[in-house]
Amino acid sequence: MQKTIERREVREEGNAEIRELIYAMLNGDTYTSLQAIGALGAMGAPVVEPLVRTLLTVDSDARWSVAMALARAGTEAVEPLVGVVLVADDGIKNPAIWALAEIGDRRAVDPLVGTLRTSRSECCRALTAAALLKLGDPAGIAEVEKTFEQSGEGFAGLVMEAFEGT
């Protein structure tokens, strides 16, 4: 898959530094990408909107880099990430779910419970259940336990594998 994105495709009207860091994150070598992810995350709120727009437009591999930057941006990213979880397809939703688990904000619990109940993708459901376990909210944990009872040991194994890897 092509990971490269042209500078003109990164359409942030604001800060040139944000544009340059997003470009470096998406196009740099591993070290450069990780440095850019850290720098973007440290900027907090100003990077959330441009990163969410990027999450919605780049290929699958690049989405995980964007999700890492959003997770590092912290609680300012929760509501926009919840919005992605509610409307996006699984390829975009999965990195957003991971980022929400990394942030650890309980505002994500109800939307994640909804995703666990409605997603048709076993991968998405397993990642969502792992995120709910990581968040540690009693309502989320209860929903995961209910899902384990309905789905069996195989699904529980996938969830625990995802949980231990997050």
Regions from the PLM with identified roles:
Residues 1-13, 23, 30-45, 53-56, ...:
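Structural detector for internal amphipathic alpha-helices that build alpha-solenoid repeat scaffolds
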Residues 19-25:
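Short terminal alpha-helical segments
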